Amino acid sequence: MTSPKIIVTRSQPGADQTLRALKDRQLEAVLSPALTLSRSDAAVPDLSRYGGIVFTSANGVRFLSDETDARDLPAWCVGPATASAALLEGYSPVHQSSGDGSDLSHYIAHHWPSGTDRRLLHVANAAARGNVKTALEAEGFEVDFLPLYEASTAPALANAAYRLISTGDPSLVLVHSAKGARAFLDLCDGLDLSALSYVAISEQAAGPLREDGQKNIAIAPHPDEAHLLETLDDLLSRI
């Protein structure tokens, strides 16, 4: 039986990385990023005031790296993709936690070097929740939030994705965030989505899908790209 086609809704440049991973698996996929990322108007503060930078996405790493050449502050990253982006940009040292922002906060609190300035800068999407800031402040850190980039709904579905959904053929949609899931549903307004199944990076990311009544949602056991793709592999093996 032919594997269903896969729709990648992740924003760029990460979407291209996901597409390459799918091609390595000899899977047919179409790109249709549900979100467009852009620089916000937030000013970057003097980084010398901080004892470290908290990154909860690879995009945060990329946007900050475009703004400053400073790389000497410890980078505290959620997940391997964010840590890899920080290493590629030359940050040192780079610390990596597994899980989500709450796990990262716990990791920082338990691995923070004694005697080091406990003031942190959290770089993220303007719509990011304040969970990281709240959790770290409860552990005695002083945290400034820098909403360095914004994510807005893409103008439309990619033509290939629109045609694929319109055919009614079974297809799989990869979902990397709750905001991306909500944007994808908005872009699909008026389309019959009954033939779609979903693989979401986390239960939080799947939230808008469940609220919309979507069915056939598989959740990665850990919120990172590797486990998302493993969940996809497992799902395809049972089709």
Functional labels for PLM-detected ranges:
Residues M1-I239:
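Signature of uroporphyrinogen-III synthase
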